[in-house]
Amino acid sequence: MRWLAAALLLALACCSDARTLYRNEATAIALSGGLTPQLFQARGLNVLGFQRLGREHATLTVYIEGDGRAWLNPWQPSTDPTPTDPVGLRLAAADPANPLLYLARPCQYETSNGCDHHLWTNARLSPEVVDLFQQLIDEAMLRTNSVQLGLVGYSGGGALAALLAERRRDVAWLVTVAANLDLAEWVRLEDIEPLSGSIDPADDAAAITRLPQVHFVGEHDRVVPPTVAKAFVQRLPGTNTSRVIVEPGFDHTCCWAAVWPQLLGQIGISR
């Protein structure tokens, strides 16, 4: 038993050291884009954010990070979902919008008593997670005196952004990157277990039929194939303004951040 306890303590220490390293790297990325760190506390969880809040009464742009390192392997959840490469943060740092808020996902970079592996595995898109982000965004809207917001989500953060857009009336536009917007289609293609504790954005896609939205996908993305976003858009009834843009040569992580300002310029969202 002693060796087991020692091994557990060593694993926890290594996890803590890695989390600190990743947090320092994330802070450096954020500072390079003029974003300052802010730790938010809501619903028993600590959520790391970075923000640029110099303008008031403007459209608040909110970025939501991807799922991070949710699994160690197909059978074992990770003990720390912090992303090794925070693509969502890199996108936010490359975006000059002001005001802007970036939000990591629950238990990334920061731990708390409320952290449980279900929050980054089967319940990553649960009603509880959606409500948490609703609260964080509501508070940010008050801080900036904003009356509307735009949502940008990377990977699983794009699915969360879609769920938020379906539930809010102050969203001006939605942009996703490599997002698993149709969970049923995604688990079918990837041959994985359904996310039993999560809400599928595709089930209520009709709620955002008239919302301006652009879904970027990578031609060579094997994590979330382009057909997933296309399946989501097909769930939008009648006439809609949605677009699925397939970027040639891109995959799930490459090369979004490098050309993000140009991609934003091409779609012409109003901010």
Regions of interest found by a model, annotated:
Residues 179-180, 184-241, 245-251:
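The feature captures the conserved acid-bearing segment of alpha/beta-hydrolase catalytic domains
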Residues 238-271:
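C-terminal catalytic histidine-bearing segment of alpha/beta-hydrolase fold enzymes
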Residues 43-47, 52-104, 109:
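Short, surface-exposed "cap/lid" segments of acyl-processing enzymes
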Residues 12-14:
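C-terminal motif of bacterial Sec signal peptides marking the signal peptidase cleavage site
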